[in-house]
Amino acid sequence: MSIHEFSARLINGEEKALSDYKDQVLLIVNTASKCGLTPQYEELQILYETYKDQGFTVLGFPSNQFMNQEPGDHNEIAAFCERNYGVSFPIFEKVKVNGKEAHPLFQYLTSQQGGLFTEKIKWNFTKFLIDRSGNVVKRYAPSTSPIKIKDDIEELL
């Protein structure tokens, strides 16, 4: 099994098969607009712009599960990301990342790379690095600066 077997709805409502990202290195991130870590969008965009021509993509999945820090609707989220951080990488519709109602992709991601003490995602901006075959290679804590992941991305490109 790999992440290529899942699909998710883009922020514009279009269903997107993750198999469309075969042969790409991915960084999948649960995001929020009203979090102290929200400025990480800037570094995520820098990584995307730096490596997109080499087969790298960031996939952002907004979630409101942590202290209601993503209260906006899909249009508000898309506008916020573009206006404040110039985000041009794919942003998906808001999802749940923990619990029985967690999106199947996040159930899979956490089963493949658990966190410290638990599989659960503890906060916004948890990051999962995916290789070109769709395998979950590494999980990064919310506090990990996206730029610090650069060497790991380059190894997979």
UniProtKB/Swiss-Prot annotation:
Do you know which InterPro entries this protein is assigned to? Glutathione_peroxidase, GPX_AS, GPX_CS, Thioredoxin-like_sf
GO: which molecular function terms? peroxidase activity
Q: Keyword Cell cycle on this protein?
A: no
Q: What is its EC number?
A: 1.-.-.-
Record-annotated active site: 35
A GO BP entry is: cellular response to oxidative stress
EC class of the enzyme, as a word: oxidoreductase
- Domain of life, per UniProt, equals Bacteria
Record's keyword terms, sorted = Oxidoreductase, Peroxidase
Describe the family membership recorded for this protein in Swiss-Prot or TrEMBL: Belongs to the glutathione peroxidase family.
Q: What is this protein called?
A: Glutathione peroxidase homolog BsaA
What is the protein's species of origin? Halalkalibacterium halodurans (strain ATCC BAA-125 / DSM 18197 / FERM 7344 / JCM 9153 / C-125) (Bacillus halodurans)
Which gene is the coding source of this polypeptide chain? bsaA
